[in-house]
A protein has these predicted regions:
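SAM-dependent methyltransferase
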Residues: 8-77
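C-terminal lobe and adjacent flexible extensions of AdoMet/dcAdoMet transferase-like proteins
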Residues: 70-123
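Short glycine-dipeptide loop
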Residues: 1-7
Length: 123
């Protein structure tokens, strides 16, 4: 990282995955349509989803694309420990509005920096 740089990333939370649960979602317009089948294992904190996309080609045919994804929910404490174990400093966990993340936050933004680097100024 740059001497004054930060490491910023986001992650979806257990709260978010529980809220979408085991549901299916779909949407369609002229250029693309999708079907999203979601499954959340609360015990393992693993969210699995199958996504099928239909994308309109130039000749007006629709090409099908299938994807499968898995995401794990990590607590802020787990992320903090991983950051500190990597030799970085955990600065904060915030929501989309910049407020401290809570148990009801859907997406958490994590801010960290390298140890020994100059603290952020004029942020």
């Amino acid at each position: 990282l740059d001497p004054n740089g930060i490491f910023l990333f986001d992650l979806k939370t257990d709260h978010y995955f529980k809220s979408i649960g085991c549901q299916s979602f779909c949407d369609a317009d002229e250029e693309v349509s999708f079907i999203w089948d979601n499954d959340y294992d609360e015990e393992k904190r693993i969210n699995s989803y199958a996504l099928t996309l239909f994308v309109q080609e130039e000749d007006n045919r629709y090409e099908r694309f299938d994807e499968y994804h898995e995401q794990r929910a990590f607590s802020i404490d787990e992320v903090r420990c991983a950051i500190e174990e990597s030799g970085m400093i955990f600065l904060s966990a915030i929501d989309k509005n910049g407020a401290p993340a809570t148990k009801d936050t859907d997406r958490v933004y994590i801010i960290a920096r390298e140890k020994g680097k100059t603290p952020l100024q004029n942020l």
